[in-house]
Swiss-Prot record:
A motif ('KMSKS' region) lies at residues 622-626. It is found in: Cytoplasm. Its cofactor is Zn(2+). It comes from Paraburkholderia phymatum (strain DSM 17167 / CIP 108236 / LMG 21445 / STM815) (Burkholderia phymatum). This is Isoleucine--tRNA ligase. NCBIfam families: ileS. Belongs to the class-I aminoacyl-tRNA synthetase family. IleS type 1 subfamily.
Length: 945
C-alpha cells in the first residue's frame, strides 16, 4: 500500500505518523454500489470466482425459483441476500459454491396478465408466445433488482422452467413416475377456483375470514319403523320430524347424498313442537335453545345403532327431482364441538364426504356434481339452475324454509379457503384429474410415497429444527397430489386418451419421450401443434390429446431433475446441499420437491432445509398496502444503500419474523458507520505498510500485538462455526462487539500512541502494523458475505493487486506461541483497565483531571493481577492511556484498588503525555525525551504495548 500523507495540510513542526487512505469515511452507498455492480459484471467477477474455485469440493445451494411476475419486494430481498451470504461464506471457506439463479415461468399469474392485456379469446399458440415474452421481460427486471442488492451468481445463464430443455425434462420426469406406477386418474374433490377455472395445489390455498349463512336443516323420516327400532322403541310416538344437520355451505344441499354420524357419539330422539328431532345428546340443550323451542328426550342410542337408516332430502317437498333418500354412514371425523353432531354429506364437495361415500360403495357415476367449473349450477338443476352458488345460498335457505325443514339460519364468520391469486373463495369440487398417489407402492419399492417422503424428512437437517415437525405433519396428513391443471400456459401432460374408455394409449411411456424430444427443440408449443398421426398413426381415430397441463409446483418441484441433473448438470449436482426459502415453502417448493424426488430417486433432493420468516413492520404487523407499512428494497437501496438492507438481514434472527422500520434502519445505518470507521482506521494505518518489506516475525511482535492477533483468530474460529450453521445474527453481533470493544475500545485505542509517535520504521510500529495487517485481512473476509460492497471497496484499497476479495479464502493467521495463556493474561489486564478507567472518570467528574493523560495511577494488586500488571513494566501506562503507572503488591483482594494522581509535569506538544523530561532539551523545549528520540535519535524501545 502506498503512503498517503495528508499533503493538503501544512507540515507540522514535530509531525506524527497520521496517515490518510482513499477509503472514505462516508460510504455514499447509493452512488457507489451501482458502480460496483457494473464493475463486477464488466470484469466477470462471478466467472473468476468459479475459475479460482475449480477443483474444490462443491457446495450447491439450489435456488428456489421466484415467479417471473412483478417487481422484487422485501421478501425477495431477504431470500436472495440470505442465499448470497451463504454462497459467499462457503466460497470463502474453500468450497466451489456455485449459485445458479432460477425463475418459475408457467402458470396462472402470467396467463392472467396476458388475458388482461389481450383478452381471453387468443388462440393457445399466441397465448404461449406472449406468455414467453412477458416472462422474459419480467425476469430481466427482477434480475437487475437482485444484482443491485449485491447478489453474485450466474446471472447470464440462469435456469428458467420455460426453457425448452427444462420443459422437456419435466415431461421425462412425468414419464418416470408413471413408469413406477405413481400416477392414476380418478374422480376426487380437489381445491377448485372458479376464477382460475382450474384445480389448485395445496400451496395455492390461503385462508381468510368469510361470512356465510349457516343452517340447521331437518331431513325427515323415510322409514319411521326402522328409526324407532334403532332407538329401542316399538314405534315412534309420531312420524313428524327427522334428523338435523348443521352446515355453513347451504349451496351443497342440492347435492346431498348421505348423512354422517360418529359411531360412538350418543344421539337423542327429542320430542319438540317441530316434531321428533334426532340430535347428538350433548348438543340437545344448545340446539333447542337456538331454535327457540323446548323438548324432551324420549330415547338415546349410539351412532352405530343408526347406521344405514334413511331420511328424505330436505327439498323433497319443494320439487320432484329431490324426492330421494339419504342413508346414514358412520365416520370418525364427526364431532360435537359445533352444530348438531350430524354432518350432511355431498361427496362431490368434501374430501371426507367423498371418502365416506366411496367407502360405502358409491360409484363415481352416481356422485351428483351440479356445480360447473365457473361456479354456476348446471341449467338442469331444479330450482337453482344457472345460478352462482354464492347467489343461490339465500334462495336455498328460502326454499328450505318454505319446505318446512329449516330450523334456524344465521350469519357466521369463519376462516375459509381462498385462491392465493384472485383472493376469492374456492370450493372442493369433484373432477376427473390426474393424481400422484401418496399411499401407492411403486413397482420398484415396498414403501409408499408417503413412507419414503417421511423417511427422507428424518434424514434431512433442518435450520431451524422446528421445520422438521412441520413438514413431517404436512406430508403425513396430505391427500393425493393433484398433478393436472386446466390451463394453457403450462407443461402438457402429453397423453393420448381413448375417446370412449378414457384409457391411456398402450405406448404412453414411449410417446412421452417422443413428445419430450420435440419439446426440447420447439418448446411446449410442439405439443399444441402436434398432429397425433405423426406419433400414433391410425390410432389417432380412437385417441385424443389430453388437454391438461402439469401443476406449476411440479415445474419447480422437479428442478432437481431437469436443472441439477439436466440443463445445468455441469455446474450443479444432485442432491443439493441446501434448499433455502420462506416458511410458506414447507407446503410449497420444499414439499413438492420432496415428493418428486421421493418418487424419482427414493430420497430427498436436499441434504438440508433452511427456513426464514416473513418481514413485518416495527410493531410486528404484516406488511400490506392497506396499512401503508410496506418497505421497498429498491427505494431503500437508492436512499441508504443495499448494504444497509444486507446488514439488517444479517443482524436479524431470520428464523422468526424479520422486523423492519425507519427506526430500525436508522440503527442499522449507525452500526454500519461504526464498522466503516473501524475499517478506515485499519486501512489508514496500513497505508505505508508493505508486507514484503515491513512485516515483523511473530517472535518480534509486542505482547499486545500477539494478543490482538490471537484474539482475532479465536473470533474467526467462532464466527466460522456460526457460518457453518447458517447463523448470521451472532456473526454480526460478535463482529460489532469486536470492532467497538476489542478494537475501538481497547486495542486500537492503546495502539494510537505507538502508531502515531514512534519512528515510522521502528520495530514497535511495524509490529503494530503487522498485527493490523492480519486483523484487516481477517475482518474483511469475515464481513464479505454480508457487507459485500464495503468489503470489496476496502479490499481494493488494501490489496489493489488482487482481482476481488471473493476469490480469496478465510485468512490463515500466524501461530501465536502460548496463545491461550496470553489470552487469559490480557483478559485479566483488561479487567484491571476497566477499573482504572472507572477511577479516571470519577477523577474527571471531580475536576481533578482533564484527559486521562493528565493522570498517573497507582494500582494496588494481589497475586496474578499484580504479576500480570508488573510484567508490562514501563509499558503499563500505554495500556492504561495515562502518563504514569505504578503497581504496588498487596496481600489480599480486599486491599486492591486504584489511586489517581494528577501529574505535576508538563505536557509534551507532540505525544500529549505529561513527562518529567519535557523542557529538558534546549533545542526542543516542548518535547519529551521519547519524542525527541523517536524523531531525531534511535527511537524508544517497547516490549509489551
Amino acid at each position: 500500500m502506498s503512503n498517503k500523507k495528508a499533503d493538503s495540510k501544512p507540515q507540522a513542526r514535530y509531525p506524527v505518523n497520521l496517515l490518510d487512505t482513499p477509503f472514505p469515511m462516508r460510504g455514499d452507498l447509493p452512488r457507489r454500489e451501482p458502480q460496483w455492480v457494473k464493475d463486477w459484471q464488466e470484469r466477470k467477477i462471478y466467472e473468476k470466482i468459479r475459475a479460482a474455485s475449480k477443483g474444490r469440493k462443491k457446495f450447491i445451494l439450489h435456488d428456489g425459483p421466484p415467479y417471473a411476475n412483478g417487481d422484487i419486494h422485501l421478501g425477495h430481498a431477504v431470500n436472495k441476500i440470505l442465499k448470497d451470504m451463504i454462497v459467499k461464506a462457503r466460497n470463502l471457506a474453500g468450497f466451489d459454491a456455485v449459485y445458479v439463479p432460477g425463475w418459475d415461468c408457467h402458470g396462472m399469474p402470467i396467463e392472467i396478465q396476458i388475458e388482461k392485456q389481450f383478452g381471453k379469446s387468443l388462440p393457445a399458440a399466441e397465448v404461449m408466445q406472449k406468455a414467453r415474452a412477458y416472462a422474459t421481460e419480467q425476469i430481466e427486471k427482477q434480475k437487475a433488482g437482485f444484482r443491485r442488492l449485491g447478489v453474485l451468481g450466474d446471472w447470464d445463464n440462469p435456469y428458467k422452467t420455460m426453457n425448452f430443455a427444462n420443459e422437456a425434462g419435466e415431461i421425462r420426469a412425468l414419464a418416470k413416475i408413471m413408469e413406477k406406477g405413481y400416477v392414476f386418474r380418478g374422480l376426487k374433490p380437489v381445491n377448485w377456483c372458479f376464477d382460475c377455472g382450474s384445480a389448485l395445489a395445496e400451496a395455492e390455498v390461503e385462508y381468510k375470514d368469510k361470512t356465510d349463512p349457516t343452517i340447521d336443516v331437518m331431513f325427515t323420516f323415510a322409514d319411521p319403523e326402522k328409526t324407532a327400532h334403532a332407538f329401542g322403541l316399538a314405534a315412534l310416538p309420531r312420524n313428524e320430524g327427522g334428523i338435523v344437520i348443521w352446515t355453513t355451505t347451504p349451496w351443497t344441499i342440492p347435492a346431498n347424498q348421505a348423512l354422517n354420524l360418529h359411531p360412538e357419539i350418543v344421539y337423542a330422539l327429542v320430542d319438540t313442537p317441530r316434531g321428533l328431532l334426532i340430535l347428538a345428546e350433548e348438543r340437545v340443550e344448545a340446539c333447542l335453545k337456538s331454535y327457540g323451542i323446548a323438548g324432551t328426550v324420549i330415547a338415546t342410542a349410539p351412532g352405530a345403532k343408526l347406521a344405514n337408516l334413511r331420511f328424505n332430502h330436505p327439498l323433497a317437498s319443494a320439487h320432484p327431482s329431490y324426492k330421494r333418500t339419504s342413508p346414514v354412514y358412520l365416520g370418525d371425523y364427526v364431532t360435537t364441538e359445533t352444530g348438531t353432531g350430524i354432518v350432511h354429506s355431498s361427496p362431490a364437495y368434501g374430501v371426507e364426504d367423498f371418502i365416506s361415500c366411496k367407502t360405502h360403495g358409491m360409484a363415481d357415476s352416481d356422485i351428483l356434481s351440479p356445480v360447473m367449473g365457473d361456479g354456476r349450477y348446471i341449467e338442469s338443476l331444479a330450482l337453482f339452475g344457472g345460478l352462482s352458488i354464492w347467489d343461490a345460498n339465500p334462495k336455498i335457505v328460502e326454499a328450505l324454509d318454505e319446505a318446512g325443514t329449516l330450523l334456524r339460519t344465521e350469519k357466521y364468520l369463519h376462516s375459509y379457503m381462498h385462491c392465493w391469486r384472485h383472493k376469492t373463495p374456492i370450493i372442493y369440487r369433484a373432477t376427473s384429474q390426474w393424481f400422484a398417489g401418496m399411499d401407492i407402492k411403486p413397482n420398484d419399492s415396498d414403501k409408499t410415497l408417503r413412507e419414503t417422503a417421511l423417511e427422507g424428512i428424518e434424514a434431512t437437517a433442518f435450520y431451524p429444527s422446528w421445520g422438521k415437525q412441520r413438514l413431517f405433519a404436512m406430508i403425513a396428513n396430505r391427500p393425493d397430489w393433484t398433478l393436472s391443471r386446466q390451463r394453457q400456459w403450462g407443461v402438457p401432460m402429453a397423453f393420448f386418451v381413448h375417446k370412449e374408455t378414457g384409457e391411456l394409449h398402450p405406448r404412453t411411456l414411449e410417446l412421452l419421450e417422443e413428445v419430450a424430444k420435440r419439446v426440447e427443440v420447439s418448446g411446449i408449443e410442439a405439443w399444441q401443434t402436434l398432429d397425433p398421426r405423426e406419433l400414433i398413426g391410425d390410432d389417432a381415430n380412437m385417441y385424443e390429446k389430453n388437454r391438461d397441463t402439469l401443476d406449476v409446483w411440479f415445474d419447480s418441484g422437479t428442478t432437481h431433475w431437469h436443472v441439477l441433473r439436466g440443463s445445468h448438470k455441469d455446474e450443479l449436482q444432485f442432491p443439493a446441499d441446501l434448499y433455502l426459502e420462506g416458511s410458506d415453502q414447507h407446503r410449497g417448493w420444499f414439499h413438492s420437491s420432496l415428493l418428486t424426488a421421493s418418487m424419482l430417486d427414493g430420497r430427498p433432493p436436499y441434504n438440508a432445509l433452511l427456513t426464514h420468516g416473513f418481514t413485518v413492520d416495527g410493531e410486528g404487523r404484516k406488511m400490506s398496502k392497506s396499512l401503508g407499512n410496506g418497505i421497498d428494497p429498491h427505494e431503500v437501496s437508492n436512499r441508504l444503500g443495499a448494504e444497509i438492507i444486507r446488514l439488517w438481514i444479517a443482524s436479524t434472527d431470520y428464523s422468526g419474523e424479520l422486523a423492519i422500520s425507519e427506526e430500525i434502519l436508522k440503527r442499522v445505518t449507525e452500526s454500519y458507520r461504526r464498522i466503516r470507521n473501524t475499517l478506515r482506521f485499519l486501512l489508514a494505518n496500513l497505508s505505508d505498510f508493505d508486507i514484503g518489506k515491513h512485516a515483523r516475525p511473530v517472535g518480534e511482535w509486542l505482547e499486545i500485538d500477539r494478543y490482538a492477533v490471537a484474539l482475532t483468530a479465536n473470533l474467526q474460529a467462532d464466527i466460522l462455526s456460526h457460518y457453518d450453521r447458517y447463523e448470521f445474527h451472532p456473526v454480526v453481533a460478535k463482529l460489532q462487539t469486536f470492532c467497538s470493544e476489542d478494537l475501538g475500545g481497547f486495542y486500537l485505542d492503546v495502539l494510537k500512541d505507538r502508531l502515531y509517535t514512534t519512528a515510522a520504521d521502528s520495530k514497535a510500529r511495524r509490529s503494530a502494523q503487522t498485527a493490523l495487517y492480519h486483523i484487516a485481512h481477517g475482518l474483511l473476509r469475515l464481513m464479505a458475505p454480508f457487507l459485500s460492497f464495503t468489503a470489496e471497496e476496502a479490499w481494493k484499497v488494501f490489496q489493489p493487486q488482487s482481482e476481488t476479495i471473493y476469490t480469496e479464502t478465510y485468512h490463515a493467521y500466524p501461530d501465536v506461541p502460548e496463545a491461550s495463556t496470553l489470552l487469559d493474561k490480557w483478559t485479566l489486564l483488561r479487567a484491571v483497565r476497566s477499573d482504572v478507567t472507572k477511577a479516571l472518570e470519577e477523577a474527571r467528574v471531580a475536576n481533578q483531571i482533564g484527559s486521562s493523560l493528565q493522570a498517573e495511577v497507582e494500582i494496588r494488586a494481589a497475586g496474578a493481577r499484580h504479576d500480570a500488571l508488573a510484567s508490562l513494566g514501563a509499558d503499563l501506562k500505554f495500556v492504561l492511556i495515562t502518563s504514569g503507572a505504578t503497581v504496588v503488591k498487596v496481600d489480599s483482594v480486599d486491599e486492591e484498588g486504584v489511586d489517581v494522581i494528577t501529574s505535576k509535569y508538563l505536557k509534551c506538544e507532540r505525544c500529549w503525555h505529561y513527562r518529567k523530561d519535557v523542557g529538558e532539551s534546549a533545542e526542543h523545549p516542548t518535547l519529551c525525551g521519547r519524542c525527541i528520540s523517536n524523531l531525531f535519535g534511535n527511537g524508544e524501545t517497547r516490549s509489551a504495548a
